[in-house]
Amino acid sequence: MSKLTEKVALVTGGSRGIGAAIAKRLAADGASVAITYAKDASAASAVVKAIKLDGGKAVAIQADAADVEAVKGAVEKTVATFGRLDVLVNNAGTAIPKTFEETTFDEMDRVIDINVRGTLAATQAALKHMKSGGRIIMIGSSVGERVLVPGLVPYAATKGAVKMFTQGLAREVGGRGITVNNVQPGPIDTDLNPAAGDWAVPQKAVTALDRYGRVDEVAALVAFVAGPESSYITGANLTVDGGMNA
């Protein structure tokens, strides 16, 4: 029996990059998986198809992470489809790589709405279905610990908020057997932050391993936190950053 057999997971922003890798890994470990996507239905469908081809169960739900009601609705649709919710992975996120002085408040609002408000909304809705036991997993960022490159001020602020939300919530729901943890990736090779992109050189330079990470390396840590082996870990901020914060 796989370690997540009979479990149900919801991965927000699961149509590409880190989110898609997480969804596929949780499905490979036995979970039925729902993913949300904002606009790209074809990418979301491709993730669902890949999971089903490997014998898993999956569904894609359209929900802009900046829309609180849509995010809450995605949680309810997940439960309606699979009958329960055991694991929530708050992966949806965005960044605007500009200096703080050049960033508009509309741009900052978008980052806050997705990275913070969307995370709060999904978590609050999910907790209603986790009366006893469950896993809440945030996908934060290594810049929530330490900012080593310029141009990420609003993003870093939101990821710092996610870090403290994790620690505070872990205290509130621990008595119900629910764990809350924050996985903090460093530079990971995705379409939004490619290892050959304009921002790659300074990010790679501050890692101890002198390379970008892979999406499967993040997914592996998330799978561990979602599984039974991590049952005594909560309120933790777990970096997978190639030693960026070493």
Model-derived features: positions:
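Short C-terminal tail/terminal secondary-structure segment
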Residues: 146, 223, 234-246
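Substrate-binding pocket helix/loop in short-chain dehydrogenase/reductase
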Residues: 99-100, 104-112, 203
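Alpha-helical segment proximal to the catalytic Tyr-Lys
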Residues: 128, 171-172, 231
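Active-site helix of classical SDR
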Residues: 123, 158, 166
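Short, small/polar-rich loop/turn modules that mediate ligand/substrate recognition or access, typified
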Residues: 174, 179, 233-235
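Conserved glycine-rich cofactor-binding loop
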Residues: 8, 15-16
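A conserved structural motif in NAD(P)-dependent oxidoreductases
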Residues: 207-218, 229
